[in-house]
């Protein structure tokens, strides 16, 4: 034992004893692969032992010289390492001994202070006191980076895992609790540094770069009635030179260094996987482009066989000096991942699920409709409740935007029913992208995009599947918006050129749906709206607060992935602008859609009822009855929703038994006030916000937060590669309008419909970029933590919540079995469809990689 053990702590008391503890730490790393100079492994810890001190804080014995605060023990220091928990490489965990003096008066420690006098930071995972007399084991869950003490303005403090409501906090810990929250809030000034732990808000004024010219200017989102938006994390970077209201951007090469509070950054395994997947995608992206240089039609796929070559046949590794130089520059861990032998080669994209069983089934009408219920964007379809469909756009600004679909277009496909009869029998549904797209369509079509706003009507057949009836494609009126639109209606056909036109009509719908999915269903409704909850929770709820402990796992990595997205995905000229049809108007469009965002409607039952695909029914298991019984997303989702709500109800009910306890919780009230007035401040005056006056309002709100962060995000994210990895199925852009009779394009459509289709949808370069992106986003990292799991089994000391969490996990296991059973039921045709792709996006658990299943706790990718 080489650590220094101090004595004489208690001023001459002879009843002092030794309390032994175990500290688990992880060494520093830079790119989360190698940083031997900063490593805190092996012999370096022999020196470090004297440079990391721990002081316990009593929760029962006060310090008369320190006001109403708990007494500190004398410093104790790290001793020799006990064991290494993982292989001794960058990112490994090592356990160390530490010994404290203790006596009866000191009682149970409620917190400890750590001081790092070393030159490098390290990751502190936990401290466990093995046997505090009369109290047993005391566990401190830390999971935090500790920088050298000179970087901090106040002590680093960690609390034991016993939760307390503010009013129940031991008096001697109260000041520490309050001061820690003040530290995390900061003062709203200055540029944030890597070691900062400050959570603060800002508007989206960092998407553009006006210093690089007008084409790189982007609208500021948030802080205005015209473009409202959820708040993001503040970085404090200086303004641009040309626009003092725009925040400057960091160089692309430094993208990984964009500020988020240090403990919000990806862990070492997550960063390793993330960078590896990105490198694989870059290689997969570049090689076909090199081949295209020698192609007669560069940047075009000439046939579907050309597209399929992305996934087949290019496994042979290249040789020569270029490849050797590339591999020499890549860290060892990445090379192992890149060259692994699990069937995914570096030089080809994995075969997407939608074409794994059949190369052509994706083109069927049944699959086109099924993906509205079980694909990557199953949250848009709604029941048709008026015919013809009417627009909600202001007629003074946009003229007549109502649908031109008539009964004559569809009544021959309604199994003998009239339109009114079909509507009254809940048989008619609509995929409606018209009102979202029309206000921007004139501007969008001035770019390379040439597309329409679409409405698709569908009929619910007796076998439970949906049948497309008609597609309406609309353009802004050439004489001006006030004159409405020009529209054309297309109906199904399987004969001649009309069949090819119908396939193109479905492609235009898919372009609409893909853009709406990526910007609204995915980015806005999960990533963007959840970030204010992350910030407010850390600013207003102490780590001691039970609700902080409830929600904390559902915020893991969200600020990091969102910051990365602002840097390289949703920024001006970023990957998203380069791949979706909305182009440079994408984020601005999402701000307009946010005007209609309603927090209580994000609850799954409320969403289903609002879209008319379910009705309230107290006799149904989840309080609603589905009008499409075989609706995989809704069926599985309601099971998950119910499990989450039961867990949250059990948990919250343990701490709050009355309205009064909710109202007197000053941290809880400050949290909810800040969420409404700052985090989602552009909607602070909306009447629908829960008032947070009752336990039920807390339960409902926390259930919705967890649902958004976990299951909703899983449903709209991890199916991206399985369905959109094959771009003809979900094209992101259309480059020319529907061919008109008598034109060369129409003749080409008759002569070579496949080539005409491919020349209409996403070009080769955009396809490769888009497929590379969705492959990265669809992968689970190897350190993912799924719904029903926790990073530490010691996350709380309270036994009843631990038992409730165990029940939650068992319920999720039961749901997995039910999903497997439903997917094996041949009567439920929408579960797998013509492409034979079983619906598993709400299957709770998964292994790492491209699995098409698994619900991570948080918006983590």
Curated annotation (Swiss-Prot):
Family: Belongs to the lipoxygenase family.
Cofactor detail note: Binds 1 Fe cation per subunit. Iron is tightly bound.
Pfam family, one: PLAT
Necessary cofactors: Fe cation
Residue span, PLAT domain: 29-160
Keyword Ribosomal protein recorded: no
Subcellular location: Cytoplasm
Tissue distribution: Expressed in tubers. Detected in sprouts and flowers. but not in leaves or stems.
CDD domains assigned to the protein according to its UniProt record, in alphabetical order: PLAT_LH2 (cd01751)
Primary location group: cytoplasm
Pathway: Lipid metabolism; oxylipin biosynthesis
Biological role: Plant lipoxygenases may be involved in a number of diverse aspects of plant physiology including growth and development, pest resistance, and senescence or responses to wounding. Catalyzes the hydroperoxidation of lipids containing a cis,cis-1,4-pentadiene structure.
EC annotation from Swiss-Prot or TrEMBL: 1.13.11.58
Biological process according to GO: fatty acid biosynthetic process; lipid oxidation; oxylipin biosynthetic process
Gene3D superfamilies: 3.10.450.60, Lipoxygenase-1, Domain 2, Lipoxygenase-1, Domain 3, Lipoxygenase-1, Domain 5, PLAT/LH2 domain
Organism: Solanum tuberosum (Potato)
Induction or repression: Up-regulated by pathogen infection, and by jasmonate or arachidonate treatments. No induction by linoleic acid.
Catalytically driven reaction(s): (9Z,12Z)-octadecadienoate + O2 = (9S)-hydroperoxy-(10E,12Z)-octadecadienoate
Keyword field: Cytoplasm, Dioxygenase, Fatty acid biosynthesis, Fatty acid metabolism, Iron, Lipid biosynthesis, Lipid metabolism, Metal-binding, Oxidoreductase, Oxylipin biosynthesis
Lipoxygenase domain ranges (all copies): 163-861
GO cellular component, as recorded: cytoplasm
Binding-site residues for Fe cation, renumbered to this chain: 522, 527, 713, 717, 861
One GO MF term attached to the UniProt entry: metal ion binding
Name of the protein described by the UniProt record: Probable linoleate 9S-lipoxygenase 7
Quaternary structure annotation from Swiss-Prot or TrEMBL: Monomer.
């Amino acid at each position: 034992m080489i650590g220094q053990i101090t004595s004489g702590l208690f001023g001459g008391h002879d009843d002092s004893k030794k309390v032994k503890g175990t500290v688990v730490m992880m060494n520093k790393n830079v790119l989360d692969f190698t940083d031997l100079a900063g490593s805190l492994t092996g012999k370096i810890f022999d020196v470090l032992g004297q440079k990391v001190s721990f002081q316990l804080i009593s929760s029962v014995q006060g310090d008369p010289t320190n006001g109403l605060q708990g007494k500190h023990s004398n410093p104790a220091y790290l001793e020799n390492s006990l064991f290494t928990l993982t292989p001794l490489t960058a990112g490994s965990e090592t356990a160390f001994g530490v010994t404290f003096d203790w006596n009866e008066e000191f009682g149970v420690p409620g917190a400890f202070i750590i001081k790092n006098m070393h030159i490098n930071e390290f990751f502190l995972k936990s401290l466990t006191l093995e046997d505090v007399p009369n109290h047993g084991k005391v566990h401190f869950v830390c999971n935090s980076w500790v920088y050298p003490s000179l970087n901090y303005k106040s002590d680093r403090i960690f609390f034991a895992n016993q939760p307390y409501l503010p009013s129940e906090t031991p008096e001697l810990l109260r000041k520490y609790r309050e001061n820690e929250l003040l530290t995390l809030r900061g003062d709203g000034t200055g540029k944030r540094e890597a070691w900062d732990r400050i959570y603060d808000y800002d508007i989206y004024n960092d998407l553009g770069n006006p210093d690089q010219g007008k084409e790189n200017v982007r609208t500021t989102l948030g802080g205005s009635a015209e473009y409202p938006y959820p708040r993001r994390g503040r970085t404090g970077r200086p303004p641009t030179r040309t626009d003092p209201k725009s925040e400057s951007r960091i160089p692309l090469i430094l993208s990984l260094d964009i500020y988020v509070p240090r403990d919000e950054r990806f862990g070492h395994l997550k960063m390793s996987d993330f960078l590896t997947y990105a490198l694989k995608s870059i290689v997969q992206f570049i090689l076909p482009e090199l081949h295209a240089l020698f192609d007669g039609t560069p940047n075009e796929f000439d046939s579907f066989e050309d597209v399929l070559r992305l996934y087949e046949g290019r496994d042979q590794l290249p040789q020569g000096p270029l490849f050797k130089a590339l591999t020499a520059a890549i860290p060892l861990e990445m090379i192992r991942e890149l060259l692994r032998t699990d069937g995914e080669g570096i030089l080809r994209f994995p075969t997407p699920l939608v074409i794994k069983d059949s190369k052509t089934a994706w083109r069927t009408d049944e699959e086109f409709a099924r993906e509205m219920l079980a694909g990557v964007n199953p949250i848009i379809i709604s029941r048709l409740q008026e015919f013809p469909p009417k627009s909600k756009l202001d007629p003074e600004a946009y003229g007549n935007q109502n649908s031109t679909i008539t009964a004559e277009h569809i009544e021959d496909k309604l199994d003998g029913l009239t339109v009114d009869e079909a509507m009254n029998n809940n048989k008619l549904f609509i995929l409606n992208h018209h009102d979202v797209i029309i206000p921007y369509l004139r501007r969008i079509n001035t770019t390379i995009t040439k597309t329409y706003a679409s409405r698709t009507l569908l009929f619910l057949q007796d076998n439970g599947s949906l049948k497309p009836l008609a597609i309406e494609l609309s353009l802004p009126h050439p004489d001006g918006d006030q004159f409405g639109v020009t529209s054309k209606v297309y109906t199904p056909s399987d004969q001649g050129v009309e069949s090819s036109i119908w396939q193109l009509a479905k492609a235009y719908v898919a372009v609409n749906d893909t853009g709406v999915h990526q910007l609204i269903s995915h980015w806005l409704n999960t990533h963007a709206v959840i970030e204010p909850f992350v910030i407010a929770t850390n600013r207003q709820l102490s780590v001691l607060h039970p609700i902080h402990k409830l929600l904390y796992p559902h915020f893991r990595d969200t600020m990091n992935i969102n910051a990365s997205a602002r840097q390289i995905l949703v920024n001006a000229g970023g990957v998203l602008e380069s791949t979706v049809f909305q182009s440079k108007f994408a984020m601005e469009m999402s701000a307009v859609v946010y005007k209609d965002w309603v927090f209580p409607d994000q609850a799954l039952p409320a969403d289903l009822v609002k879209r008319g695909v379910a009705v309230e029914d107290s006799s149904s298991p989840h309080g609603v009855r589905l009008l499409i019984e075989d609706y995989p997303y809704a069926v599985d989702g309601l099971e998950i929703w119910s499990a989450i709500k039961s867990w949250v109800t059990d948990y919250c009910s343990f701490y709050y038994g009355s309205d009064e306890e909710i109202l007197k919780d000053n941290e809880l009230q400050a949290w909810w006030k800040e969420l409404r007035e700052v985090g989602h401040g552009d909607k602070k005056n909306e009447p629908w916000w829960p008032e947070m006056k009752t336990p039920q309002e807390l339960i409902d709100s926390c259930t919705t937060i967890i649902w958004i962060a976990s299951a909703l995000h899983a449903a709209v994210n991890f199916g991206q590669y399985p369905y959109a990895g094959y771009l003809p199925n979900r094209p992101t852009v259309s480059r020319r309008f529907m061919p008109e009779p008598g034109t060369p394009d129409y003749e080409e459509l008759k002569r070579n419909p496949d080539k005409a289709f491919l020349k209409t949808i996403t070009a080769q370069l955009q396809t490769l970029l888009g497929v590379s992106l969705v492959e990265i986003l669809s992968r689970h990292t190897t350190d993912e933590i799924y719904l029903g799991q926790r990073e530490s089994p010691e996350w709380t000391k309270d036994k009843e919540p631990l038992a409730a969490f165990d029940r939650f996990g068992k319920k999720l296991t039961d749901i997995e079995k039910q999903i497997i059973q439903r997917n094996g039921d041949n009567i439920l045709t929408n579960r797998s469809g013509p492409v034979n792709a079983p619906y598993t996006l709400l299957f709770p658990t998964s292994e790492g990689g491209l699995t098409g299943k698994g619900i991570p706790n948080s918006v983590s990718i």
